[in-house]
């Protein structure tokens, strides 16, 4: 068990930092070109790195069994999910569909990511007050306004993330409705 924890800390932390920095530096360099077709990809990558980093940082501060634990893995998993959303945006043209474009395609990863960031901040906040994981409703025994506010932020963030997830489906379906323009 200790070996697994050690491997997670080494592989999930220091090993990822150089890759994340390279990705962010690459995006910032590409940003100078201001190519509208790259905006949705840039949004997905930056929000992915942000959420994955938040999940990693939260993992460092886990003590005991409370809702900080699901905050950690929600951040990490959502970071990967956002990267996969960006990958879908990238491969659609290779499959013969239009590349997702426009404001909705650019804002969708940020909406999903910011909703999830609110979700995990609410969990970390409540976890700081000792709110237990794997319990719901009255069993949570939310004793203070701060605990209720943290869980409320978690719920609001979750709702925003659901809307962002549904927008991902809308963006992809719109791109798939129109075949890719053939260049001669």
Feature annotation, model-predicted:
Residues 115, 157, 170-173:
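Short, well-ordered alpha-helical packing segments
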Residues 8-18, 73-81:
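Alpha-helical transmembrane segments
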Residues 14-18, 146-166:
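Hydrophobic alpha-helical transmembrane segments
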Residues 83, 119, 161:
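Short, electropositive, low-hydrophobicity segments enriched in small/polar residues
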Residues 52-57, 115-121:
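Aromatic-anchored segments of alpha-helical transmembrane domains
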Residues 50-53, 160:
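C-type cytochrome heme-c attachment and multiheme electron-transfer modules
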Residues 1-7, 23-46, 57-73, 82-110, ...:
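Juxtamembrane membrane-water interface segments of multi-pass membrane proteins
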């Amino acid at each position: 068990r200790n070996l697994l924890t050690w491997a997670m800390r080494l592989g999930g932390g220091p090993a990822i930092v150089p890759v994340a920095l390279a990705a962010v530096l690459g995006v910032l360099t590409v940003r100078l070109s201001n190519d509208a077709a790259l905006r949705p990809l840039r949004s997905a990558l930056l929000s992915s790195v942000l959420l994955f980093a938040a999940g990693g940082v939260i993992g460092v501060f886990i003590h005991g069994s409370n809702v900080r634990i699901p905050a950690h893995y929600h951040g990490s998993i959502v970071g990967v999910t956002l990267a996969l959303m960006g990958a879908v945006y990238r491969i659609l043209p290779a499959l013969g569909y239009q590349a997702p474009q426009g404001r909705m395609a650019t804002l969708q990863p940020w909406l999903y990511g910011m909703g999830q960031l609110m979700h995990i901040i609410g969990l970390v906040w409540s976890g700081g007050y000792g709110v237990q994981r794997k319990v719901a409703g009255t069993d949570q025994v939310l004793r203070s306004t701060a605990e209720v506010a943290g869980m409320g932020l978690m719920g609001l963030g979750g709702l925003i993330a659901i809307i962002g997830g549904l927008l991902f489906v809308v963006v992809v379906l719109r791109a798939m409705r129109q075949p890719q323009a053939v260049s001669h």
